[in-house]
Amino acid sequence: MNAQAASPAAVSQTGPYFCEMPSDPCAIIMFGASGDLARRKLMPALYDLAFHSCLAPSFRLLGFARTKMSDDDFRKSAGEFLPKGQEEGADDAKKSEFLKNLQYFTGDYDDAAAFQNLAKRLEELDKEGGLGGNRLFYLATPPEVYTHVIQQLRQANLTKSKGDKSWTRIIIEKPFGRDLASAKALNAKVLEAFDESQVYRIDHYLGKETVQNMLVFRFGNGIFEPLWNRNYIDSVQITAAESLGVERRAAFYETAGAMRDMIQSHVLQLTSLVAMEAPARFDATSVRNEKIKVLQSMRPFTTESVWKDVVRGQYGPGQINGKPVPGYRQEPGVKPASSTDTFAALKLHVDNWRWSGVPFYLRSGKRLAQPHTEVAILFKRAPHMVFRGENTETNSLVLNIQPEEGISLSFGAKTPGSQMLIRPVEMDFQYKNTFGASSRPAYATLINDCIRGDATLFDRADSVEAAWALVDPILNTWAGAAAPPFPNYPAGSDGPRAADDLTGADGRHWRPL
């Protein structure tokens, strides 16, 4: 994530994102290459980088998985998820050029001989493509095999850079542990094999343009930062809503739930970006130092505050877009009496000078009314209301993260006519309208940053552990008590009634989905 100004002319000529020069040539070794994440998300992201000349033409992608297939089969499988027809990037010549750089390697994740052979193959790729020994390992496997892969890479002497001018890095997908103890154990295993500077713990939400733009919006403009504190802000709401159910992830979701899957990672990462202080410099160390300070300033949950300030829910049967959908307990692979949370909401306090007394309301859930992720900054009312009765809405600044990325500011304005009637209006900025095209896929942004050695948007070990330290008391309290009467919200709704009570007890209300 390089910080530099681009002129309007440059943006209009090159599109909303471009690379002035390709990255270093490298080998990308993708573990779990036959899985859904690799095929549906990572391959399109890598192709996007190649299409926009962000990858060196000589890059090599080596897929590693247990599934047996040939190089051609692997290329065919990857090609099924690349742009087609009128989609942006649907260029047959460029797709063919991209796919020819893909190769496949069959092996078990705990097979030492397979990793020795992998090391030999990488030496061959270095010579074949002039890659200079640069290697990016990507763990797109189930989390239970992370330590197996890392141990085998270490034993095969693949975790250290080959020389002063080469680099070796590893991207690790979430979930990074399932509680504080397991996160610490995994960090210890990773750091036995790699230096922290080599490790890129990925959270794809942080690759979205609006999320990155929070930093520019706050610290690159002189308008809003003076208001970004307890003197002017009444509350903050962060919503990550999905209309989808668990799809094919029931086995994983039964062991996770909304609190582990979304709140601990995506939502707390957004919160730290909203609440952080200005970094001394815009580099990975400075930004991540400020984020960890926020996480460490969050008020710990006690058993009492969990029951008061945290809500969990599970969806029942309902309708999405006018079509009936089953409840969570009726989904294939889910236990008939499952107590897994598909919705979580909480009130959070950041105990520092900037945010003292400002509640942060966080929520995330599946099978909600609309797929929508946003950060809403709700400002305090004017100290003296000269105009009464017409404009009942507070001023708000909303950063829309998905599905449509953009920023909107709402305020009161007089309606035309002789009477002093006031209604809320909005000023909107949308990426596609301003820049004329969709923003870069989040995974493409993050992979590109990793190849270029920029860790700004990736988690550090201490921030992962701090997030788990906050969430652990909630999970432990839930584990020691019976779940609420599930299901407690129908699919297609805004969530359980108890979530409305969470804000209602403070005289506030959630923004509608």
Language model region names:
Residues 1-172, 176-513:
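Secretory/organelle targeting and membrane-embedding segments
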